[in-house]
């Protein structure tokens, strides 16, 4: 074919073209040669001489399409009950034919229509150069537009009514023609799919809106029927079944954009409209832990707004009640272990339930945390919360040498699990005080099962609460290794003296930082060191002063222990004793009988401490009370028990020093209160320094927020701290408002 423009007879060329496009649009056979000739004819018309005939070709093609669609419309109308089937048949034929026509008219589309086509801006803001009423469209688009205007819109009511009826029959169990229904609905999408903006607007307006209304009505009635014939479990099962069926139905018939809208409408009618009924059954389902019902209820309630909160609240109450039942009435002897293991058991049970039944939903995990927080921090009216102390004792039991039958790995696993419970404590500072006191006893008295386990536990607490929380614990741990090094240096110091020095005893010492250890430096009694120990103490003080100038050593004799060999019996016994007990026993080196007054003079101990020490030796029958009176007084005298015997050749004499006393517990809690006051005062100063001016309520909220990681401060305590800082002139009340504070620089 020649590409050169030439004179063309439009009527003759159009008649040939018309015959071909009639065949094309009806999917009749067209020979390849004919197709090529018609393609050339369209080109010739578009480049015709003296003037192109593209505009006339477009107009005639449009007239043909209008005529053809009107003809098909009449035939569909005449089919009566077969409207959907006939519509679908003609649509399938017409839409494919329109695609072929669009290919045939490719040159017209690209060279004439696209060049003269209005842009979206032209349509929106107006453009005088082209007739605004009839914007040009590519031939494929024009064909679809004709179908929409001349077929779909006139048949709209009939088509929609029939489609809704067929889908309703499908819901009722009948088996309608899926291909026809899907094809008809898809035609509503296809006729405007070429549009760049809102291509689904026509489909949504003509079909989706009435379909959603019909769906809502249908499932409203369906829910009403189901409620009359079912209990809650059955209702949930059936509703889930209906939702699944409707989802399959959506995929069979509708455009993907409609799936969620339809399912949402079903959920509104069958779930949201009956929330009160579902919520009323929620309590018994959770109380009885009916897992299948819980899973079904979760799936249903999750899908509607304000559906889940009630279920979350019910589960939280249930976990709280079960937790309290598990942790109450525990035997006193094993309370720390039973308490922690009971909480872990409840935690493990409900974590598994939430993961397997409730899809691991974080809202329920948060409810679990809140419930167990209230369980762990529960306290009887007018009593303190026992959890911090119990948890500290639990760790103490695990980390002591007396934790029999457990390997280090088993202890490690238990301590890792323990952190789960620890995180629920509000008063972490109370735990820290008890833990530090128990750690001190383990370290000083050599009771730790393993120093590696001690360090691992401190690191776990550090990960949970930060460096500041464990800084003192770290220093205590470090002091032990530093002391071991110090002992080696001291032994070298003794060996390297010019004159040979015999201390007379093997001697080990711990040098502890006063600020890190929870130890009272004020002894409960005065004390004179036994002569046998004096030399070693003096030499260590000399060594220490030479190595660390400016440091002051304070001897904590009440914490010291030693071993005493008993050479006066048939068996070679060794007694592990406190320094106070040692001082009393060493008095018997010079005499088998010693009076109370002599002991008082030699030890310089006060009456209370001396009496307690003597009593501990009487209890194990190492000495005898040479008096008919039971009570110890100034006239008492004591003698060595020469017939003493024990199953063990090495034994320990326990004292109240190693046991927890009510006074110690009270001291610990008092120390916590003092620390809290200082912490709150520091927090208030920090906040006010940054903010300069702050209202009362805002300051209190800031302080609570900053303190929550360590403890939950009471508002009354915060107020007292504010008053203290006003007295100390760190802050002042604002002159403008009594409800406002200013930072004093």
Swiss-Prot record:
Core component of multiple cullin-RING-based ECS (ElonginB/C-CUL2/5-SOCS-box protein) E3 ubiquitin-protein ligase complexes, which mediate the ubiquitination of target proteins. CUL2 may serve as a rigid scaffold in the complex and may contribute to catalysis through positioning of the substrate and the ubiquitin-conjugating enzyme. The E3 ubiquitin-protein ligase activity of the complex is dependent on the neddylation of the cullin subunit and is inhibited by the association of the deneddylated cullin subunit with TIP120A/CAND1. This is Cullin-2. PANTHER family: CULLIN. The lineage of its organism: Eukaryota, Metazoa, Chordata, Craniata, Vertebrata. Keywords: Acetylation, Isopeptide bond, Nucleus, Phosphoprotein, Ubl conjugation, Ubl conjugation pathway. There is a cross-link at residue 689 (Glycyl lysine isopeptide (Lys-Gly) (interchain with G-Cter in NEDD8)). Transmembrane segments: none annotated. GO terms for molecular function: protein-containing complex binding; ubiquitin ligase complex scaffold activity; ubiquitin protein ligase binding. Residues 675-735 form the Cullin neddylation domain. It comes from Mus musculus. Its main location: nucleus. It comes from the Eukaryota. The modification N6-acetyllysine is found at residue 393. The modification Phosphothreonine is found at residue 661. Component of multiple Cul2-RING (CRL2) E3 ubiquitin-protein ligase complexes consisting of CUL2, Elongin BC (ELOB and ELOC), RBX1 and a variable substrate-specific adapter; this complex is also known as ECS (Elongin BC-CUL2/5-SOCS-box protein) complex and may consist of CUL2 or CUL5. Component of the ECS(VHL) or CBC(VHL) complex containing CUL2, RBX1, ELOB, ELOC and VHL. Component of the ECS(MED8) complex with the probable substrate recognition component MED8. GO terms for cellular component: Cul2-RING ubiquitin ligase complex; nucleolus; nucleoplasm; VCB complex.
């Amino acid at each position: 074919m020649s590409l050169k423009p030439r004179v063309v007879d439009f009527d003759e060329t159009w008649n040939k073209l018309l015959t071909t496009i009639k065949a094309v649009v009806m999917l009749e056979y067209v020979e390849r040669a004919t197709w090529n000739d018609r393609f050339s004819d369209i080109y010739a018309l578009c480049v015709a001489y003296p003037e192109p005939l593209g505009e006339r070709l477009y107009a005639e093609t449009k007239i043909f399409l209008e005529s053809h669609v009107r003809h098909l419309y009449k035939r569909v109308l005449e089919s009566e009950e077969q409207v959907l089937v006939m519509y679908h048949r003609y649509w399938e034929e017409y839409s494919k034919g329109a695609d072929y026509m669009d290919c045939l008219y490719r040159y017209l589309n690209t060279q004439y229509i696209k060049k003269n086509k209005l842009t979206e801006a032209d349509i929106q803001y107006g453009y005088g150069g082209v007739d605004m009423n009839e914007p040009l469209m590519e031939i494929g688009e024009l064909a679809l537009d004709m179908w929409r205007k001349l077929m779909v819109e006139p048949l709209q009511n009939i088509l929609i009514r029939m489609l809704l009826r067929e889908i309703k029959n499908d819901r009722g169990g009948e088996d309608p023609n899926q291909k026809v229904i899907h094809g008809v609905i898809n035609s509503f999408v296809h006729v405007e799919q070429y549009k760049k903006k809102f291509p689904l607007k026509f489909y949504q307006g003509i079909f989706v809106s009435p379909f959603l209304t019909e769906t809502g009505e249908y499932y409203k009635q369906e829910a009403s029927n189901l409620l009359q014939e079912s209990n809650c479990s059955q209702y949930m099962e059936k509703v889930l079944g209906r939702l699944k069926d409707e989802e399959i139905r959506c995929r069979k018939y509708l455009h993907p954009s409609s799936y969620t809208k339809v399912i949402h409408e079903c959920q509104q009618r069958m779930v949201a409209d009956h929330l009160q009924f579902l919520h009323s059954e929620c309590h018994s389902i959770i109380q009885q832990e009916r897992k299948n019902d819980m899973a079904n209820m979760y799936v249903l309630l999750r899908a509607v707004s304000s559906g889940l909160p009630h279920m979350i609240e019910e589960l939280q109450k249930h976990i709280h009640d079960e937790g309290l039942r598990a942790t109450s009435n525990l035997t006193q002897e094993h309370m720390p272990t039973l308490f922690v293991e009971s909480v872990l058991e409840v935690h493990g049970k409900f974590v598994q339930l939430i993961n397997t039944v409730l899809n691991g939903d974080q809202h329920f995990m948060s409810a679990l945390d809140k419930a167990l927080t209230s369980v762990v921090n529960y306290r009887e009216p007018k009593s303190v919360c026992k959890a911090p102390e119990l948890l500290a004792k639990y760790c103490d039991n695990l980390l002591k040498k007396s934790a029999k039958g457990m390997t280090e790995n088993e202890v490690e696993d238990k301590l890792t699990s323990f952190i789960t419970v620890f995180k629920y404590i509000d008063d972490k500072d109370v735990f820290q005080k008890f833990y530090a006191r128990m750690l001190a006893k383990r370290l000083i008295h050599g009771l730790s099962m393993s120093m590696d386990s001690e360090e691992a536990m401190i690191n776990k607490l550090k990960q949970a609460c930060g460096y500041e929380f464990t800084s003192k614990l770290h220093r205590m741990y470090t002091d032990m290794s530093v002391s071991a090094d110090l002992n080696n240096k001291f032994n070298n110091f003794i060996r390297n003296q010019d004159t040979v020095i015999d201390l007379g005893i093997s001697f080990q010492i711990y040098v502890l930082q006063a600020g890190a250890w929870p130890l009272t430096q004020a002894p409960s009694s005065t004390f004179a060191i036994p002569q046998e120990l004096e030399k070693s103490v003096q030499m260590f003080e000399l060594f220490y002063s030479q190595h660390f100038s400016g440091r002051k050593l304070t001897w904590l004799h009440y914490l010291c222990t030693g071993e005493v060999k008993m050479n006066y019996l048939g068996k070679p016994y060794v007694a592990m004793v406190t320094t106070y007990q040692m001082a009393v026993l060493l008095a018997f080196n010079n005499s088998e009988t010693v009076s109370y007054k002599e002991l008082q003079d030699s030890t310089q101990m006060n009456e209370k401490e001396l009496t307690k020490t003597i009593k501990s030796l009487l209890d194990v029958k190492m000495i005898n009370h040479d008096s008919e009176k039971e009570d110890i007084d100034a006239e008492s005298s004591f003698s060595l028990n020469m017939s003493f015997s024990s199953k063990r050749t090495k034994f320990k004499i326990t004292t109240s020093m190693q046991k927890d006393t009510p006074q110690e517990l009270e001291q610990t809690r008092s120390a916590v209160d003092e620390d809290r006051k200082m912490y709150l005062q520091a927090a208030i100063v920090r906040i006010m320094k940054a903010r300069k001016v702050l209202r009362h309520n805002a300051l209190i909220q800031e302080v609570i927020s900053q303190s929550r990681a360590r403890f939950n401060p009471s508002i009354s305590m915060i107020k007292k701290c504010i008053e203290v800082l006003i007295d100390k002139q760190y802050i002042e009340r604002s002159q403008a408002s009594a409800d406002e504070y200013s930072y004093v620089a």
